[in-house]
């Protein structure tokens, strides 16, 4: 009789364990999927803005927007896999790989990134520090649970097709954004030294800066050492305009000042200064994010554009 009881309880225990695992996989997959959907969607929809944030997180200058688009596509794809029960194992594997990559990147550049906003999510500010690794460790745990206990993957055709569609959509959005940014034209008129000015002719270099920013200070000092040709430099303080003259005097940058920051920043959006825009006859030739103001950059690009010797 006891043997019969033991035999009947074994399948019940096994069934209970399987049910518990399915529940753990479902909860972990949904939570991690939401995180990746929000984070990835943000990157895909605005790769140029997020690209600046990535470059500030030590991604090589110029590769931020592409990196944002690629990472965003992979994150949204991972979310799709995690939301689809039969693909949760693959979603867990890819999600875990992404989390390990993020944790490893921040750990490697920790001394440079500590205290800065990681730029992981829209609206939510999350500073790099010990807490960053704790929260990302929890996300990694979610991915490992889905990878370990998710149902076996049988076919890859549907996931491959989904990835292809997402890549096409992300690529199209990236191309549209690039064309849109390139086709922006200088507004008219712009107040320069307090007077309405037409900056739609000739070579113009817009230099956005914060007078209290050490990186802006270094960038301005470096720009002042370049041999400028016939380009006109317009310096635009993003904060504390009362210090504009002192800033230019201290950094020895020969530039005219414009306080039309709202008008110009509306046309040429960016995250944090320093930021530069090279224009010829009012049309954008190239823009320079914060990460591109580390000497000897952006001299080479300005030479190619004919702005400096």
Region annotations inferred by a language model:
Residues 1-23:
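Short, Lys/Arg-rich, polar N-terminal cytosolic tail immediately upstream
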Residues 22-44, 64-105, 140-141:
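Functionalized membrane-embedded alpha-helices
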Residues 83-90, 149-159:
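Membrane-interface helix-boundary motifs at transmembrane edges
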Residues 100-149:
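Membrane-embedded alpha-helical segments of integral membrane proteins
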Residues 153-180:
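Internal/C-terminal transmembrane anchor helices
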Residues 196-217, 222-226, 236:
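Short active-site neighborhood of thiol/selenol oxidoreductases, capturing the structured segment around
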Residues 230-263:
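Thiol-based oxidoreductase modules, predominantly thioredoxin-like and allied folds used
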Residues 269-309:
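Non-catalytic, surface beta->alpha helical segment in thiol-disulfide oxidoreductase systems
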């Amino acid at each position: 009789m006891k043997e019969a009881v033991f035999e009947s309880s074994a399948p019940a225990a096994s069934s209970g364990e399987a049910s518990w695992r399915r529940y753990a996989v479902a909860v972990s997959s949904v939570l991690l999927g939401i995180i990746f959907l929000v984070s990835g969607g943000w990157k895909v929809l605005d790769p140029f803005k997020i690209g600046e944030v990535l470059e500030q997180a030590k991604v090589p200058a110029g590769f931020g927007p592409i990196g944002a688009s690629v990472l965003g596509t992979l994150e949204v794809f991972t979310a799709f896999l995690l939301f689809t029960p039969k693909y949760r194992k693959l979603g867990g594997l890819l999600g875990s790989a992404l989390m390990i990559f993020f944790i490893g990147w921040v750990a490697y550049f920790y001394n440079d990134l500590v205290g800065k906003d990681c730029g992981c999510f829209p609206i939510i500010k999350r500073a790099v520090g010990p807490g960053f690794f704790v929260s990302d460790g929890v996300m990694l745990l979610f991915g490992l649970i889905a990878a370990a206990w998710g149902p076996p993957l049988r076919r890859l055709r549907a996931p491959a097709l989904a990835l292809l569609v997402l890549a096409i959509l992300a690529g199209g959005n990236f191309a549209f954004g690039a064309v849109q940014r390139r086709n922006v034209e200088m507004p008219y008129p712009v107040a320069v030294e307090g007077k309405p000015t037409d900056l739609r002719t000739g070579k113009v270099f817009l230099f956005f800066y914060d007078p209290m920013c050490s990186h802006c200070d270094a960038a301005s000092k470096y720009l002042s050492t370049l041999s400028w040709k016939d380009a006109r430099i317009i310096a635009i303080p993003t904060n504390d305009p009362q210090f504009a003259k002192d800033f230019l005097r201290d950094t020895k940058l020969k530039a005219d000042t414009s306080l039309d920051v709202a008008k110009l920043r509306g046309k040429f959006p960016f995250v944090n200064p320093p930021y530069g825009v090279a224009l010829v006859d009012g049309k954008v030739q190239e823009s320079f994010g914060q990460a591109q103001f580390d000497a000897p950059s952006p001299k080479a690009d300005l030479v190619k554009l004919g702005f400096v010797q």
